[in-house]
Amino acid sequence: MDSKDESSHVWPTSAEHEQNAAQVHFVPDTGTVAQIVYTDDQVRPPQQVVYTADGASYTSVDGPEHTLVYIHPVEAAQTLFTDPGQVAYVQQDATAQQTPLGGLEAKEEEDEDEDEDTEEDEEEDGEDADLDDWEPDPPRPFDPHDLWCEECNNAHSSVCPKHGPLHPIPNRPVLTRARASLPLVLYIDRFLGGVFSKRRIPKRTQLGPVEGPLVRGSELKDCYIHLKVSLDKGDRKDRDLHEDLWFELSDETLCNWMMFVRPAQNHLEQNLVAYQYGHHVYYTTIKNVEPKQELKVWYAASYAEFVNQKIHDISEEERKVLREQEKNWPCYECNRRFISSEQLQQHLNSHDEKLDVFSRTRGRGRGRGKRRFGPGRRPGRPPKFIRLEITSENGEKSDDGTQDLLHFPTKEQFDEAEPATLNGLDQPEQTTIPIPQLPQETQSSLEHEPETHTLHLQPQHEESVVPTQSTLTADDMRRAKRIRNAALQHLFIRKSFRPFKCLQCGKAFREKDKLDQHLRFHGREGNCPLTCDLCNKGFISSASLESHMKLHSDQKTYSCIFCPESFDRLDLLKDHVAIHINDGYFTCPTCKKRFPDFIQVKKHVRSFHSEKIYQCTECDKAFCRPDKLRLHMLRHSDRKDFLCSTCGKQFKRKDKLREHMQRMHNPEREAKKADRISRSKTFKPRITSTDYDSFTFKCRLCMMGFRRRGMLVNHLSKRHPDMKIEEVPELTLPIIKPNRDYFCQYCDKVYKSASKRKAHILKNHPGAELPPSIRKLRPAGPGEPDPMLSTHTQLTGTIATPPVCCPHCSKQYSSKTKMVQHIRKKHPEFAQLSSTIHTPLTTAVISATPAVLTTDSATGETVVTTDLLTQAMTELSQTLTTDYRTPQGDYQRIQYIPVSQSASGLQQPQHIQLQVVQVAPATSPHQSQQSTVDVGQLHDPQPYPQHAIQVQHIQVSGQPLSPSAQQAQQGLSPSHIQGSSSTQGQALQQQQQQQQNSSVQHTYLPSAWNSFRGYSSEIQMMTLPPGQFVITDSGVATPVTTGQVKAVTSGHYVLSESQSDLEEKQTSALSGGVQVQPPAHSDSLDPQTTSQQQTTQYIITTTTNGNGSSEVHITKP
């Protein structure tokens, strides 16, 4: 029998085995064949795979150069030749025996002389073929080592000598539990071991739990990582244990795939953290795992202490590597990398500021009907490239010196440009910027050495202006080269730019490495992997050969999508499809859709009605074109490489960014929006209808009613943007929101919001159908069930919340969070100030005590923030709960301005300092009384609480203080509050004269101001407004100007809640020695004191929170 034939019977041969086989050894005499197959040529230690006659395979990682496996024909024992002089017989009971090797020399001689082997095999074949005189053996008794032959009806010690060997069909290999439980996104390397990722796994992804038998610590075997499980007292008692157990992760049949995850040696290669949660141990990713990256685990901080291990500390080198890995946004000008695109954009702006040659100033010049920057570029848009032409000494242009400079325009430069710039109206046809001769050491660093360099800028328009001159240094030239490289790389990425072309076949490539790899096939002198049988032309891939074979076939390649006709040329097909035009349109043969162009219907058929053979590996979607599949795969990716330079929004696809720019940042849309805001619209009031009064929310200007509060707010913001919220009483009512319970239809969980229920279903019930949204429900038709039943919600009540108004428009929301989101979206310029926004207060602050301030700072009084409006709203809001009232943290700015009638005599003081040392709630002494205020007189019906502000002292700087003031400044306490004397009143008059043009200070009282501020208040300096209001006795408010001040003839400086309260305060003021009297008693007073009273007034003005001064008409009650 031929040895080759015997080998084919014994071995499962394949093309792969024949290519990889290194040697085939034939064991002499009665032995069978053993074959050595070496692995592929990868960069690994020398490995050998040995295939034996029984179909099994053995791998030797660090084995000898030659390994032979011999199957003994009689004893069925494996013989392993490990030493040239020894033979190891591996019996079936796994015992080994070393014996001297006697037949190895004969075997090697036969291997050296192949002809002799062939002759001996042919002789054996001749002997085996002579079976004419063969007689069956007598029946043999049962022996488990004999092979049964059904044809002979007898057993043989080996292969049947007459009928030959059997044709075995081996069992299908069954994976172990550990390998079968491996997730689809992971794979196990069969050579290196360890678990690797097929695709990107994001951070904070949980894997597990770990499965395997639990053993004691003394029974642990050698494995990758040791994991300990903390057991409860009940579990220990049930198992009769006194210690915690460990996972035994050495048996693939009992564990899951997590036994193959190898431990990390340092913090840099660690991407998983192990911890115990409940009765299970999980792995969680601590960083993004990239494709083909190995998963490596180490213990969490608390779990490491539990298993007596140390966590991996981050070294300084690892910290630098991690910092560089996080920077995924490179700058192609200075080779720096940044973490985010915003940082990269800010860095690029710094490059634009440094480059003075390409700086552009703002202007308004835009040409009409002029030449554009190539096809498809809008007028006024800057050129993408600036051509740098280096002129030699004799004036000739050098082609080698041409460089393309990439310009990065900012948004302002994009909008407007001045005439003398690149986008101006008047531009020369060629702007020349001469550059002086560079030093010799600088010239040697450049590619060219001309004496004069000229920078020629390609103009946009044809008019001429005075040339702009500047100088370029060696750094600018090197930077120009970097910009050119960045421009080339930009073209490689963004466009189908293939500059590297093969001169032999005309194929083009984007990278030079690809071209070099392609040229290797041309250098093989026609030895390409695939060859055409008709023209002997070689090809690299089967796709290239398949497309080439169409040239030799008679099959026509261009088929009509409307009929069975086909053509061998594209122009014939285009001429043919004209007969399928019906009324100027092409009709899709499948869906009857109509298209005006053949290209459109062709794309439609190819996109929607072709066979979808490209399957997505992440989901069940399939596509008919590979480019559509590539676009779809971006949905499963977290990268957003396309950034909107206007608003900062990021997109995964370039076409989505283009649609966003056309839809949101279209210049026509921006112009219409600006025009709509500036144009005032006139409305004709509608006729009063019978249904107008039935609406709760009404617009009294348009005579329109609205069912919901938000409809009225939107109407006011669009139709009446100048109208204030305070002018609409309905918008000051609390917002009523429904309170619902959201039930999970798959378990007994209940949530307070639909978003939390949705997150619960996605996490705990994957694949389950989500309940419909309440906002998208449609009213049920006749005979249909209520659609609210399908939402699995229940109304439990309502919640009333005070409205939160936007300080920049008329919008109002039920929570501050939504208002802040509105500001960030609609008012981005005020987004930084959104954290300091409070509900605006517009009520006047009217003192409840005589407004007498003395020069010694020991005197003080309490100013109560109460007036008619506050009193009325307090009485009206008594029925509301405390949830609807404004909290105590709401504040006002209070301004005290002493005004003098005489403008001569003393030096002008510089500032008046008002220091507030205490803020406390103030209760009205007549809360139990019935309201005496007409509701129709209210201008601001918002309820606010009353506060008492205790003024400790007023200090006037710019002139020497009186001795009493100096003494009070040294020791000041609220107990020094007392009435004023005549001396104090005189000093007060001197301090308060000449105050009309001086600066005053406002006291700013934010909410929770005592919690974070170590001093009493925050002082802000503000100038005196030109007109104010003075409290007078006649009930008419008079504006105070610089040249005219009305004297106060009455001593009533305070507006009280009622007349009885006013009389009580007047009595207490007179008994305290206050030198303020009505004019009827002026004869009994000191003339100097009376003069002081007539020349001193006090102005009390309120200012809302950042919205300007609110001058209130103040009169006596």
UniProtKB/Swiss-Prot annotation:
UniProt modified residues of type Phosphoserine: S398
Annotated keywords: Activator, DNA-binding, Isopeptide bond, Metal-binding, Nucleus, Phosphoprotein, Repeat, Transcription, Transcription regulation, Ubl conjugation, Zinc, Zinc-finger
Composition-biased stretches (Acidic residues): 107-136
Domain called SET: residue spans: 182-300
Bias (Basic and acidic residues) ranges: 446-464
Covalent link (Glycyl lysine isopeptide (Lys-Gly) (interchain with G-Cter in SUMO2)) residue numbers: K354
Pfam families attached to this UniProt entry: PRDM2_PR, zf-C2H2, zf-met
Gene3D superfamilies: Classic Zinc Finger, SET domain
Region entry N-terminal PR domain, spans: 201-305
Residue numbers bearing the Phosphothreonine modification: T402
CDD domains (UniProt xref): PR-SET_PRDM10
InterPro entries linked to this entry: PRDM10_PR/SET, SET_dom, SET_dom_sf, Zinc_finger/UBP_domain, Znf_C2H2_sf, Znf_C2H2_type
GO cellular component, one term: chromatin
Localization terms from the record: Nucleus
Biased composition (Basic residues): 361-381
Main localization (coarse): nucleus
One of the GO biological process terms: methylation
PANTHER family per UniProt: PR DOMAIN ZINC FINGER PROTEIN 10 (PTHR24403:SF48), ZINC FINGER PROTEIN (PTHR24403)
Function recorded in the entry: Transcriptional activator, essential for early embryonic development and survival of embryonic stem cells (ESCs). Supports cell growth and survival during early development by transcriptionally activating the expression of the translation initiation factor EIF3B, to sustain global translation. Activates the transcription of FLNC.
Note on domains (UniProt): The SET domain is degenerated, suggesting that it has lost methyltransferase activity.
Protein known as: PR domain zinc finger protein 10
